[in-house]
Amino acid sequence: MRSTNTRSARSRPTKRSVNASATPTQSFHRVDAHLSLLEGAEETGWVEFKTNTRVERIEQDADSVTVYDQNGNAYRGVALIGADGVRSVVRQTYVNDQPRVTGHVVYRAVVDKDEFPQDLRWNASSLWVGPKCHLVHYPLRGGEQYNIVVTFQSRQQEEWGVTEGSKEEVESYFQDICPKARQLIGLPKSWKRWATADREPIPQWTFGRTTLLGDAAHPTTQYMAQGACMALEDAVTLGEALRVHGNDWGKALDLYQRSRITRTARIVLSGREMGRLYHAQGVERLVRNSLWKGRTTEQFYDAIQWLYGWNVDNCLSESI
């Protein structure tokens, strides 16, 4: 971790595992993860994809759930897993709350290795922090590409969504940072812009034979870098709950919910605090740097054991 005036505040050996049985930290391209999941779903022979389809209405009884799309088509099943994102129709049906727009904007771009500065080709996730902004970069696909992610606190009113980014806008927020970090801002030929949002954690997301998963259940800011990870954990936990309870969907969905609510709520709330720490200024910045510098490597790993110590063998433990 470096400040945007080039002074290093703290570094950690991310290749080292959190505990003796854990695997080292790895980063990969999200598209590659999507393709692996798609291939796995197709290989089962049980999955039928309906694209360009929006759920408009949900009905359920004691034995089944039926969803109706925008064209009036009905789809009936034994359960409904709402994994339909931040603006979840399934969540809106049963919870009826609204996303909390943070005012923090994220710009993302991927750059080929040959275009990335030689002196910044570190085989690690690297974080530059500054007042009301931060910048992250890390290698993808064995170092053949680098992901650049910059975040700033917007000067304007934001609405949640993803749009094409403006090079002029992102440069205007990072014009005063040190040259070594600022050179990264000019590399991408195009940017994607996210106006971020989360939601308040809720104590229930299973309703009869319907439940929520991923961003539909617990949308979070990017500061813990756990949005996609939590969705994958949800899926694994749901699978384990079904293994325990067989075809009893009521018990399985209840076990799944009880296993996930506390952990995912902690991610959402921790993300908000990490955003404050990353963007600290003035005396608060000095306190942050002092706290991070004062931790030993062992203390650092102890502090994140709760996050990275999760695995399939303990995923149901919080509910028991």
From Swiss-Prot:
Its needed co-factors are: FAD
| Expression triggers | By 3-hydroxybenzoate.
InterPro entries in alphabetical order? FAD-bd, FAD-dep_Monooxygenase_BioMet, FAD/NAD-bd_sf
GO-annotated biological processes: catabolic process
- Keyword Membrane in the entry? The reply is no
Task: Name any one GO molecular function.
Answer: FAD binding
Keywords per UniProt:
Aromatic hydrocarbons catabolism, FAD, Flavoprotein, Monooxygenase, NAD, Oxidoreductase
**What reaction(s) does this enzyme catalyze?**
3-hydroxybenzoate + NADH + O2 + H(+) = 2,5-dihydroxybenzoate + NAD(+) + H2O
NCBIfam families named among the record's database cross-references:
PRK08163.1
Instruction: Write out the biased-composition intervals (Polar residues).
Output: 16-25
Give the gene symbol: hbzD
Which PANTHER family has this protein been placed in? GERANYLGERANYL DIPHOSPHATE REDUCTASE, MONOOXYGENASE
Q: Which domain of life is it from?
A: Bacteria
Can you tell me which family this protein belongs to?
Belongs to the 3-hydroxybenzoate 6-hydroxylase family.
Species, as recorded: Aquipseudomonas alcaligenes
State what protein this is by name.
Answer: 3-hydroxybenzoate 6-hydroxylase 2
Top-level EC class, please? oxidoreductase
Tell me the segments the record calls region Disordered.
1-25
Taxonomy of the source species: Bacteria, Pseudomonadati, Pseudomonadota, Gammaproteobacteria, Pseudomonadales
